[in-house]
């Protein structure tokens, strides 16, 4: 049996195994790992927001063998994700994060229409579950207008690598009924944050949206904490911020800016 191809995860040094799909592939929910992990954390008194890769990115990054293409599996994806929505809701989950980093890629008009149709159907099945769609590694210039029209409860945007993110909000606005998860602390590098730049950005955003402070992407790209770096001098450490320190930076920013923060991050 030939191994799956391995590709870089967007512009990072992480790699992923490329899914291979043929005309006989069945796309369905298998197992209950995400739900059971949520329950385990809840039992320990830890409130979590489960996170899963979204169907648009999953199917866009796959390799296809046969006549069928991504759009031919959308209905099966809607069924599988809807089942997950139900199970998480029954377990007491309030928020689910769906990562759709493929939205920062160059998208054709056909792909944009497919994305919109996919989520119009999928979000009609969410019930009381709140859905955050999270993007990262760039801006969503090709699909921003469609994205803000969809009935997501929260939208996560990258202000670090997303060069057009701020311009998009200024040009097209941001819905008052949604929460903006603003990725203003770099989640990929190991350097300290520019507080003044972040504060200036947040002051401008505060008038157009409810804002949650966020990192630009997952913190899996950086080391855990500087506390373990005992061989570094304090002078050197002053330039660095690892995962724990970046969370502290978010807390510092929260204390420093007068905007409404409806949901702790």
Predicted regions and their residues:
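Domain-level signal for soluble alpha/beta catalytic cores
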Residues: 1-265
């Amino acid at each position: 049996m030939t191994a799956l191809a391995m590709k870089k995860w967007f512009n990072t040094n992480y790699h992923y195994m490329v899914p291979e799909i043929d005309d006989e592939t069945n796309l369905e929910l298998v197992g209950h790992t995400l739900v059971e992990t949520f329950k385990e954390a809840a039992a320990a008194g830890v409130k979590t927001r489960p996170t899963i890769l979204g169907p648009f990115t999953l199917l866009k990054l796959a390799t296809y063998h046969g006549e069928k293409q991504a759009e031919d599996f959308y209905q099966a994806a809607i069924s599988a994700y809807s089942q997950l929505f139900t199970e998480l809701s029954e377990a007491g989950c309030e928020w689910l994060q769906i990562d759709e980093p493929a939205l920062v890629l160059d998208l054709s008009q056909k792909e944009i229409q497919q994305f919109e149709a996919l989520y119009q159907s999928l979000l009609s099945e969410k019930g009381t579950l709140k859905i955050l769609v999270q993007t990262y590694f760039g801006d969503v210039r090709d699909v921003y207008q469609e994205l803000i029209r969809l009935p997501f409860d929260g939208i996560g945007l990258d202000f670090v690598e997303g060069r057009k993110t701020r311009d998009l909000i200024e040009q097209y606005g941001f819905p008052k009924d949604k929460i903006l998860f603003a990725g203003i602390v770099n989640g990929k590098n190991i350097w300290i944050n520019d507080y003044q730049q972040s504060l200036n950005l947040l002051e401008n955003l505060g008038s157009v949206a409810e804002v949650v402070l966020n990192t630009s992407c997952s913190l899996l790209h950086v080391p855990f904490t500087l506390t373990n770096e005992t061989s570094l001098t304090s002078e050197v450490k002053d330039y660095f911020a690892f995962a724990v320190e970046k969370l502290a930076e978010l807390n510092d920013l929260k204390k420093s800016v007068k905007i409404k923060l409806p949901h702790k991050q």
